[in-house]
C-alpha cells in the first residue's frame, strides 16, 4: 500500500490518514479518467494535489472526508462528529469505518461542497460514489442493465442458430417432448388408418364379381384342398396386424380384423380362380387332342376302305390276267395249227 505523505505520531492515526489519502488518490484518478483534465490550480503543484494533500492542509481534507462519510451513512445511524484537527480525525474515521459496512443510497442533493480550495471537486461530483460502494453494487447501474440486455440478446441469437449447443430451460424441453410425443401418436394413428384404407381398397379391387361363371367346386372340397394356404395366409395376416393390435388402437381392431379376413378371402379366391383357369385350359387341350384323335381315326378308316377297294381291284385284275393267258395259249395253238 502506497502511503506517502504526512504520518501522525500514533499508529492508528497514521493508518487512517494513509487510508484517506489512498482513497482520495483513487477517487481523483477515477475522475481524471472520466473527465478531461482542467487548468491547473494557481499557486500549487498539480501532481501533489492529485496524488496527496500537503501536510499543512491535513485537517481540512480529513474534515471533508468525515462530512462525506456522514452523508453516506443511513438515516437511522448517528453522524460522526466534526473533526477540528488531526487528533480528532482518528475518532471520526473510526466511527465512520464501523458504520460503513451498510451504506445507504447516496443522493446528489445531500452532498455538501468540499472545504478546501486546493482539492475542489469537479461539477460531476454528485453523480459519483465512493470507491468501496460501487464495488458492492456494481450490477445495479445502467451499464449492468445494458450488459444483461446484451447477454439476453446473445442467448436469443443462440436459440436462433441451427448449430451449436444451446441451453434450453427444462420446462420448454418437457413441453417440446410432450408435443413431439403427441405428434408421433397422431402420425401413427393416421398411418394405421391410411394402411387399413389402402388394404380395404386393394381387397375390393381384387374381388372380381364376373368370375362366377367359371367352374366351381363344392365348398367342402375347396376348403379341404386349400386348408394349408388359408392357415398360412391367416398367420401372415395376424403377424402383419399384430403391431396395430399392440399399439393400443381398440377403435380400429374391428376394421383390422375385417380387412384381414378380406385379404385372406381375396387371396383364396385369386388362387381358386387361377386353378380353375388352369383346369379349363387342360380341358380345352384334352378336347383338342380328342378331336385330333378322331380325325386320325377317320383317316385310318378311309385308308382301310381304300385298301379294301384296291385289293378287290387286284383280284379282278389277276382274274383278267389268267383269262388273257388262257386266251393267248389258245391263240398260239390256233396259229400253230394254221401254219402247219
From Swiss-Prot:
Residues 182-192, 242-253 have a biased composition (Basic and acidic residues). One of its GO terms (molecular function) is enzyme binding. Keywords: Apoptosis, Coiled coil, Cytoplasm, Nucleus, Phosphoprotein, Transcription, Transcription regulation. It comes from the Eukaryota. Disulfide bonds: none annotated. InterPro entries: Par-4 (IPR026117). Changing residue 68 to D: Increased interaction with SPSB2. Only slightly increased interaction with SPSB4. Increased interaction with SPSB1, SPSB2 and SPSB4. Residues 1-18, 193-203 have a biased composition (Polar residues). Residues 145-203 are annotated as: Selective for apoptosis induction in cancer cells (SAC). Residues 47-82 have a biased composition (Low complexity). Changing residue 72 to A: Loss of interaction with SPSB1-Elongin BC complex and SPSB2 and SPSB4. Residues 300-340 are annotated as: Leucine-zipper. GO terms for biological process: actin filament bundle assembly; apoptotic process; apoptotic signaling pathway; negative regulation of B cell proliferation; negative regulation of fibroblast proliferation; negative regulation of gene expression; negative regulation of T cell proliferation; negative regulation of T cell receptor signaling pathway. The modification Phosphoserine is found at residues 108, 231. A motif (B30.2/SPRY domain-binding motif) lies at residues 68-72. Changing residue 69 to I: Only slighlty increased interaction with SPSB2. Only slightly increased interaction with SPSB4. Increased interaction with SPSB1, SPSB2 and SPSB4. Its main location: cytoplasm. Residues 186-206 form a coiled coil. Widely expressed. Expression is elevated in various neurodegenerative diseases such as amyotrophic lateral sclerosis, Alzheimer, Parkinson and Huntington diseases and stroke. Down-regulated in several cancers. The keyword Transferase does not apply. The modification Phosphothreonine is found at residue 163. Pro-apoptotic protein capable of selectively inducing apoptosis in cancer cells, sensitizing the cells to diverse apoptotic stimuli and causing regression of tumors in animal models. Induces apoptosis in certain cancer cells by activation of the Fas prodeath pathway and coparallel inhibition of NF-kappa-B transcriptional activity. Inhibits the transcriptional activation and augments the transcriptional repression mediated by WT1. Down-regulates the anti-apoptotic protein BCL2 via its interaction with WT1. Also seems to be a transcriptional repressor by itself. This is PRKC apoptosis WT1 regulator protein.
Amino acid at each position: 500500500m502506497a502511503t506517502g505523505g504526512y504520518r501522525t505520531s500514533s499508529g492508528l492515526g497514521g493508518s487512517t490518514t494513509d487510508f484517506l489519502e489512498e482513497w482520495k488518490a483513487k477517487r481523483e484518478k477515477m475522475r481524471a479518467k472520466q473527465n478531461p483534465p482542467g487548468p491547473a490550480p494557481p499557486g500549487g503543484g498539480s501532481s501533489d494535489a492529485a496524488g496527496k494533500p500537503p501536510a499543512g492542509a491535513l485537517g481540512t481534507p480529513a474534515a471533508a472526508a468525515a462530512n462525506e462519510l456522514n452523508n453516506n451513512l443511513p438515516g437511522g445511524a448517528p453522524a460522526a462528529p466534526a473533526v477540528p484537527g488531526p487528533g480528532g480525525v482518528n475518532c471520526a474515521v473510526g466511527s465512520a469505518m464501523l458504520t460503513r459496512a451498510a451504506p445507504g443510497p447516496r443522493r446528489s442533493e445531500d452532498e455538501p461542497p468540499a472545504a478546501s480550495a486546493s482539492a475542489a471537486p469537479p461539477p460531476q461530483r454528485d453523480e459519483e460514489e465512493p470507491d468501496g460502494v460501487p464495488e458492492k453494487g456494481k450490477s445495479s447501474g445502467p451499464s449492468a442493465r445494458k450488459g444483461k440486455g446484451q447477454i439476453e440478446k446473445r442467448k436469443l441469437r443462440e436459440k436462433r442458430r441451427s448449430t451449436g449447443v444451446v441451453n434450453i430451460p427444462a420446462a420448454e424441453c418437457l413441453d417440446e417432448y410432450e408435443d413431439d410425443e403427441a405428434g408421433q401418436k397422431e402420425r401413427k394413428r393416421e398411418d394405421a388408418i391410411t394402411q387399413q384404407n389402402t388394404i380395404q381398397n386393394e381387397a375390393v379391387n381384387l374381388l372380381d364379381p364376373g368370375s362366377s361363371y367359371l367352374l366351381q367346386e363344392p365348398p367342402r372340397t375347396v376348403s379341404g384342398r386349400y386348408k394349408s394356404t388359408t392357415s398360412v395366409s391367416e398367420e401372415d395376416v395376424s403377424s402383419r396386424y399384430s403391431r396395430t393390435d399392440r399399439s393400443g388402437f381398440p377403435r380400429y381392431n374391428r376394421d383390422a380384423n375385417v380387412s384381414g379376413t378380406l385379404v385372406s378371402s381375396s387371396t383364396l379366391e385369386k388362387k381358386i380362380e387361377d386353378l380353375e383357369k388352369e383346369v379349363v385350359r387342360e380341358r380345352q387341350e384334352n378336347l383338342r387332342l380328342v378331336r385330333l384323335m378322331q380325325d386320325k381315326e377317320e383317316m385310318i378308316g378311309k385308308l382301310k376302305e381304300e385298301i379294301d377297294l384296291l385289293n378287290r381291284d387286284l383280284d379282278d385284275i389277276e382274274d383278267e390276267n389268267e383269262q388273257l393267258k388262257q386266251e393267248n395259249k389258245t391263240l398260239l395253238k390256233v396259229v400253230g395249227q394254221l401254219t402247219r
